[in-house]
């Protein structure tokens, strides 16, 4: 949805720059998601035997490890984005480095709320979670459209919309996790 809105307001060059950022995010987050996914069987086991304290400890420790692992992977890319993109693409699109940095920073925020999601999934009570989070993420393209009408800078509002959604997700996931148990 955001790509369509970006293309509407700023054209294909900005859309390509965001696409490069999303590609870098996919490469880095794939590794982190595998790390987090490896904890899922243990979370389900703790939930099944009603050991909620051990489950919460695993969520907290796993979140810390995942965050610092992503930080270890993302920090060099954030610092040397221009160099990495030049190695990869020779001539990266304008704003690609900015989008890469911002998307990787947003990924760090998102990592903090991923394992609580697996805790909710372990409970099997996902109806409320899916309704709330889907409603939240459906709002991003709508907010982006309104924001780009007011603010004519492609990066500025994209950052605000993405970060607002992740901060809301970060706040809502623990609440939804409490509702699931």
Task: Identify what each model region corresponds to.
Residues 23-26, 61, 74, 83, ...:
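Residue-level recognition of pore/gate-forming positions within transmembrane alpha-helices
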Residues 12-13, 60, 77-108, 152, ...:
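Interfacial segments at transmembrane-helix termini and the short loops linking adjacent helices
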Residues 21, 25, 29-63, 117-122:
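Helix-loop junctions and terminal segments of transmembrane helices
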Residues 19, 51-80, 97-100:
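Interfacial transmembrane-helix starts/ends
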Residues 104-135, 177-181:
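Membrane-interface junctions at transmembrane-helix termini in multi-pass inner-membrane proteins
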Residues 9-12, 122-124, 150-152:
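Helix-loop interface residues and adjacent transmembrane-helix termini in multi-pass membrane transporters
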């Amino acid at each position: 949805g955001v790509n369509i809105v970006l293309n509407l307001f700023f054209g294909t060059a900005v859309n390509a720059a965001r696409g490069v950022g999303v590609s870098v995010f996919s490469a880095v987050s794939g590794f982190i998601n595998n790390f987090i996914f490896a904890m899922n069987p243990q979370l389900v086991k703790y939930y099944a035997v009603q050991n909620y304290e051990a489950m919460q400890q695993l969520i907290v420790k796993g979140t810390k490890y995942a965050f610092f692992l992503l930080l270890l992977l993302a920090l060099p890319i954030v610092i040397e984005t221009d160099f990495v993109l030049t190695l990869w693409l020779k001539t990266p699109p304008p704003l690609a480095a900015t989008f890469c940095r911002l998307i990787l920073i947003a990924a760090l925020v998102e990592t903090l709320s991923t394992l609580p999601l697996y805790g909710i999934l372990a409970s099997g009570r996902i109806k409320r979670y899916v309704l709330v989070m889907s409603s939240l993420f459906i709002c991003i393209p709508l907010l982006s459209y309104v924001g780009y009408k007011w603010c004519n800078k492609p990066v500025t509002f994209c950052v605000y919309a993405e970060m607002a959604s992740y901060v809301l997700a970060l706040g809502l996931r623990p609440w939804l996790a409490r509702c699931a148990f």
